[in-house]
Each structure stands twice: as structure tokens, then as C-alpha cells.
Amino acid sequence: MTVGIVGLGLIGGSLAKAYKKSEHTVYSYDIDKKILDFAILSGAVDDILSFENINKCNLVLLCVYP
């Protein structure tokens, strides 16, 4: 399954790690570029979620403050 996650805070980051641990493909986006870069370098996500790859996602999770 391919998952897109918007927001890599406490909830989004935890979900990204859990889906990645279950060997799913994880795309993610965060407003803070440093957090997004760290998530990619640490292996928590596969790539940046963008308009080009959002159509590949079976599930998109919005994990931002209301």
C-alpha cells in the first residue's frame, strides 16, 4: 500500500514510522523543510509528497493542527 502523510509532528511522524516498518511506501510533506529532510534521511519516509505522486497513494492522512 502507498500512504501519503501531511504533517510530520508527533502523530504524523509516528504513523510514518509505523507504515514504513510494515514495509509500505510512505510519501510525506511537512511545512518545515528540516523535519522533512530528517525524515527522508532517517528512512521514516520514502519521498516527498507532491502533486505528481499523490495520485499513487491509496491513503492520504492529514496530521496537522486544526
Residue map of PLM features:
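Short glycine-/small-residue-rich Rossmann-like dinucleotide-binding loops
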Residues: V64-P66
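Short acidic alpha-helix that forms the nucleotide-activated donor recognition element
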Residues: N55
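NAD(P)+-binding Rossmann beta1-loop-alpha1 motif at the extreme N-terminus of oxidoreductases
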Residues: M1-F51, L59
